């Protein structure tokens, strides 16, 4: 009995520790703005077990941070295949989770993480100039969300920026009706989650509702948004546009919180709940400067908030599962004591307590949030400067993108990732 318990503890706990420990070095290298070395560090410990999806997601993100957009999408495609495979969790894994802990199950990704796969795959295609392929990812965002809603009885966590990006891609392809639908969906999700409506989305809704002759909807937006003038579709077609995305810091990390709860019959039970710890911000916002024109970024996506919202939404189900598991472990300890004496019962009870750890896995290379800006410019060559603004409101770093040449109706998308200094 003692040998069995020790082997069980080693098998369960060593697998959980190895992934998080290896990521500490990855995070340190990212904070030093060395994504290529971070990728090499990650690839030293490839995961093919319960953490295989996490490995693929982190690998894909580190590849795109290193400018390897094609390779990144190869990894994202592998992740999508695996997500589909894991969608129906096997009964064996469910049993393991019910008797040991949730970390024994293959990680299939939170709702917002699954949607983020398509967001970043689409951005990769845009970086490669493959707008048709980006459009396919936009369609897959909608399909993935439909499946998640069916699985969650309509309670899936939605990402407003995913809808916005879909609209942006459709608009680039001249599919204005579909773009309007996507922008409208994005607007409604921002409202539902009580988040500020980004200025760029307000402008898009006004521009397309007017272009599509949606008179009543246009009047509604005019009343809601304090915007005096918006470029028309025709005006944008005659200009170029600089689009900026800043992927700031890293998504929150999960920690384990010990709680004492009581069953319906008054039995005291120790459970471990996952809780999120936010990463520090690197900047407050940024300013895109093109000649005499400039625009300040706004936060359009917060994976920090989406992660917390996801945990809050699923908290009741998580607690119910944890209590059920704790009761099973208590019962196993009592049975061991009845059959093998007090020592056997104690060993099983200790094993139950030690293996009762929260599932603290998550996609760690996602950013904390995404800053976004759009700036229409005349066709031609422009020198582009990025000013990063710190918490005190001062410029803390300047990035020179150099000269960029645009044609009429062409969009140039610029991306940068900035990770705050590492703190353990």
Indicate where each model-derived feature is located.
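TPR-repeat structural position
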Residues: 35-36, 69, 131, 176-177
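Bacterial Sec signal peptide processing site at the extreme N-terminus
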Residues: 13-40, 44-46
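Boundary/linker segments of alpha-helical solenoid repeat arrays
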Residues: 51-54, 83-94, 147-156, 187-219
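Short loop/turn and low-complexity linker motifs enriched in small/turn-promoting residues
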Residues: 211-424
């Amino acid at each position: 009995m003692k040998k069995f318990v020790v082997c069980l503890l080693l098998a369960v706990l060593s697998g959980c520790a190895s992934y998080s420990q290896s990521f500490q070095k990855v995070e340190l290298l990212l904070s030093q703005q060395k994504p290529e070395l971070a990728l090499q560090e990650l690839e030293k410990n490839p995961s093919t077990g319960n953490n295989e999806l996490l490995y693929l997601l982190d690998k894909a993100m580190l590849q795109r941070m290193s400018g390897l957009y094609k390779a990144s999408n190869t990894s994202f495609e592998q992740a999508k295949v695996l997500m589909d495979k894991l969608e129906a969790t096997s009964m064996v894994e469910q049993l393991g989770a019910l008797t040991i802990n949730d970390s024994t199950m293959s990680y299939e990704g939170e709702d917002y993480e699954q949607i983020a796969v398509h967001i970043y795959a689409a951005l990769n295609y845009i970086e490669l100039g493959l707008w048709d392929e980006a459009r396919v990812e936009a369609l897959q965002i909608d399909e993935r969300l439909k499946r998640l809603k069916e699985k969650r009885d309509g309670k899936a966590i939605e990402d407003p920026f995913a809808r916005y990006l879909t609209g942006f891609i459709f608009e680039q392809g001249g599919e204005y009706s579909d773009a309007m639908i996507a922008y409208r969906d994005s607007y409604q999700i921002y409202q539902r989650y009580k988040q500020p409506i980004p200025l760029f989305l307000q402008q898009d809704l006004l521009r397309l509702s007017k272009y599509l002759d949606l008179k009543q909807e246009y009047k509604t937006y005019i009343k809601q948004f304090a915007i005096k003038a918006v470029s028309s579709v025709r005006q944008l077609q005659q200009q170029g546009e600089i689009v900026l995305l800043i992927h700031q810091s890293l998504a929150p990390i999960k920690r384990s919180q010990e709680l004492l709860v009581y069953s319906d019959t008054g039995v005291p039970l120790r459970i471990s709940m996952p809780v999120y710890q936010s990463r520090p911000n690197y900047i407050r916002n940024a300013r895109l400067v093109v000649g005499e024109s400039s625009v300040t970024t706004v936060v359009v996506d917060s994976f920090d908030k989406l992660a917390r919202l996801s945990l809050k939404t699923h908290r009741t189900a998580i607690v119910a599962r944890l209590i059920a598991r704790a009761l099973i472990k208590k019962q196993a300890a009592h049975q061991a004591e009845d059959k093998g004496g007090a020592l056997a019962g104690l060993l099983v009870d200790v094993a139950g307590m030690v293996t009762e750890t929260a599932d603290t896995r998550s996609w760690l290379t996602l950013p904390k949030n995404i800053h976004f800006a759009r700036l229409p410019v005349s066709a031609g060559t422009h020198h582009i400067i990025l000013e990063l603004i710190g918490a005190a409101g001062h410029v803390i770093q300047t990035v020179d993108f150099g000269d960029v040449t645009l044609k009429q109706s062409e969009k140039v998308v610029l991306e940068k990732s900035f990770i705050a200094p590492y703190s353990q």
